[in-house]
């Protein structure tokens, strides 16, 4: 029996004390081995039926009493026979049960992500859904949970399929013309138009990468600006607690402070940075240097200004951020005179304008979209989509100046790249790279 067809076993719950712990087996011997641990279960148990059973050691002594569940393949998560033993969540007890299962020569320990990998290989999940399992396990915000759940239900798969199927049909039409030119006359008349439309679809999906990245790792937002502009007070107000020291003396904040918040389901790491000024002390200058380095790596920089700042000064402050998007606000509006400035006015002290500022920041981060519309397009997906789009761009150009054979070749390359997203074209090395990020037992 090959390693890939052996029965595998692993703990499906975290190795920590809890109310319930689960031992999972999948493969041709899952039921036999499961019944060695729970001999009171019938030889032909009813699939998807929970049996109250005694779990025993090799000498038949009871270790625990729990639930035994059998899922007959192919109607199971992995597409194989699956058995789950749900015991009390003692790490030592669960380790004893796992060790007992692994003592059987027909069983080996599952590799990271191997249960989900078998589900993919057995056609139970496409690759985007399989990756969504890992996204859901790793999700640490409401937006990440909802986006991963949408991926698991096929949101990304359906969009990839909507691009892949007409692309495959186009490729088949062109290959038909090339192979049987007399019988397929006229089948290639609209090739250029079809390629252009499909490239636009690929670009639309590729545009989701930035927002998908936000959902996966959370957003990074930095407050910056001149000293005594009210940044630290505003930071404390946005965080909801007094994290930053507030004082009228310039240079109070020397190291960037950070706090994690969740706004409308999106995880946001907020930074309060050292105030910028022309003649700081030596230690303060180090903080300012760190601020400038930080500003180039965040998703949004919020420039907080004191009263009376001119537009020329605003432009001078924004030179520090590189290509980072900047939102400019007037701080300390509670002490400033009402002005005709179009900038947003906020006060960290009173809370005036803070809710509107938070909404504006979220709007900038989402790029005008909504969290519910985010497709979890990963960096791996982005690389494949980028190659597909580039191939379609070359096909579009070739449709005007070159032969149908060249166009068909480029469309074929685009199909191969898309296949890496859906899983229709995938290597063992790629599968290894994808499933290694899963935890064992998933």
Swiss-Prot record:
It is an enzyme of class 3 (hydrolase). (6S)-5-formyl-5,6,7,8-tetrahydrofolate binds at residues 24, 84, 124, 442. Its main location: cytoplasm. The keyword Ion transport does not apply. Its EC number is 3.6.-.-. Its cofactor is K(+). Belongs to the TRAFAC class TrmE-Era-EngA-EngB-Septin-like GTPase superfamily. TrmE GTPase family. This is tRNA modification GTPase MnmE. It comes from Myxococcus xanthus (strain DK1622).
